[in-house]
Amino acid sequence: MTTGMRMVWTLNGHGWANCTVEDQQAKVEVTASYVTNAPEEFLTAVARLVFGEAETRAQFEAEPTTFRWIFYRQGDDAWIRLLRLRRGSDHDNKGTEIWSSQLHVDALARAVIRCFDEVAWTYDESVYRGKWGEHFPRTELEAVRRLWNAHLQGDDT
């Protein structure tokens, strides 16, 4: 199991973002389009995992490629699979795994919070909206932070 993960979300044109994720084993960059609520969906999946769900998912549409994040949790351990698919409606088994990692759920939450805090700091929320085309996912980010803090205090409610 790896001890850490790093994630970077970079806006690179109106409605487009690159998301780089890495651990000690590998690094991969995927693309997201604003045609879906990629950051909100991603943050919601992480929040649900931190809350205690055994499996959650998020999907980035890169037109025409789709990147599917699959999160699993057992106890305090998380396993992440990132798949590349031709279409968003394709079954997981039609995808190619391009990155995976096992880490403590705290390391996942910390990396995701740090990533989106950095996005808010770098772009400012109004600039983010202008570049991405949608509001910054403040509500979803704060949900991850609140659930992670509750998890750290031993109150998984």
Describe these PLM feature segments.
Residues E22, A32-Y34, L43-A45, F71-G75, ...:
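Surface-exposed beta-strand edges and their flanking turn/coil or helix-capping segments
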Residues M1-P39:
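N-terminal "first-domain core" detector
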Residues I70-T157:
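Long protein-protein interaction modules used by eukaryotic assembly/scaffold proteins
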Residues V21-D23, F60-A62, R84:
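Short acidic, glycine-rich loop/turn motifs
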Residues T31-I70:
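Short, well-structured hydrophobic secondary-structure segments
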Residues M5-W9, T65-R73:
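Broad, structure-driven detector of short, well-ordered beta-strand segments within folded domains
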Residues R6, A32, Q59, P137-R138:
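Alpha-helical interaction segments
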Residues N12-A17, G52-E53, Q74-D77:
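A short, compositionally biased
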